[in-house]
Amino acid sequence: MRQMVYALQFIGKAVPANEAGTVLNASLSAPQCTITTSNDSGACEGVIRTGAGPQATFESKVTFIGDTAFQEEGTITLSDKGDSIRFSTVGQGYLGTSADPKVKHGCVAWRIDSGKGRFEGATGLITSNFLVTADGEVTDHHFGLIFLK
C-alpha cells in the first residue's frame, strides 16, 4: 500500500442539530495550501499560505457525550472528482476552554472507515486540532496519513 500525507486548514460553521445543542452539524471547506514550519530564528514558527484550485470539503455530525467529550463521524472530499473518505472518532474527542476566552479549543483523532474514488479501500488516521467561537465559526487543522490500495 502507498502512503499519502495531507495537511489542510478547514474553515466553516458548526450548527446545532437538536434543541439541547448536544448534536452539531459541521460544514467546512479548505483551499489548497502550503504549510511551512521553520526554526531559523530559534523560535518555531508556522505559516499557512492558501492557493488556487479546487477546495476540499468536510461534513460531519458531532455528538457530545459529556461536558467536553464528543464522538464524530463524517465525510471529507479531497478532490473535485468526488474522491472522499468516511471517518469516525477513535476513542473520544475533546473540546474545552482556551487561553483566549473568545474561543474553545479541541482535538480529535479519526479512523478512515471507507473511501470512494482513489480512496476506495483506503485506511489510516487523521488528527484534528480546532477552534470554535460562540457563534459556531470553526477553524480546523487536519493532518492525515492515509494508506492507499
Residue ranges and their predicted role:
Residues M1-K149:
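Beta-strand-enriched cores of mature, soluble protein domains
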